Amino acid sequence: MTLQGKTIFMSGGSRGIGLEIAKRFAADGANIAIAAKTASPHPKLSGTIYTASKEIEGLGGKALPIVCDIRNEEAVDNAISSCVKQFGGIDICINNASAVSPTPTTLTPMKRYDLMNEVNARGTFMLSQKCHPHLKKA
């Protein structure tokens, strides 16, 4: 199976495993929308949606960098609309965005837990729900 011309909507993806997945799909000629908050470099982590897009395009894929916080329903709606407008639909949804805490449970502040829950559970559910109508058409 080839991903040539298929459109992937990915949350996260500006670095780490998400970027590696996107690069693999780019090598097949896929269209990849990278929806993440990383428009500017993080002081401790390399990569932005723009640097990821350059890497994707350098490997033969088409990229659409979208600034998006997947906790925000309006931002997700707008990101999906931008992807559909640019590429004509969505064939694959990859929920890659995540928030983690390297601390033991007893030392994890509730504010950090709330962030992890909003991104990892709610954001994943919402993105899947919002992509579903497009995936059914694919």
Walk through the language-model features, giving the residues of each.
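Substrate-binding pocket helix/loop in short-chain dehydrogenase/reductase
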Residues: 104-114
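Active-site loop of short-chain dehydrogenase/reductase
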Residues: 6, 61-62, 89-90, 135-138
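A short, exposed helix-loop element centered on a Lys and neighboring polar residues
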Residues: 128-129
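A glycine-rich helix->loop->beta "capping" turn
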Residues: 59-62, 82-95, 101
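Conserved glycine-rich Rossmann-like NAD(P)H-binding loop of the short-chain dehydrogenase/reductase
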Residues: 28-51
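Conserved glycine-rich cofactor-binding loop
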Residues: 7, 14-15
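The beta1-alpha1 cofactor-binding region of Rossmann-like NAD(H)/NADP(H)-dependent oxidoreductases
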Residues: 47, 67-79, 110
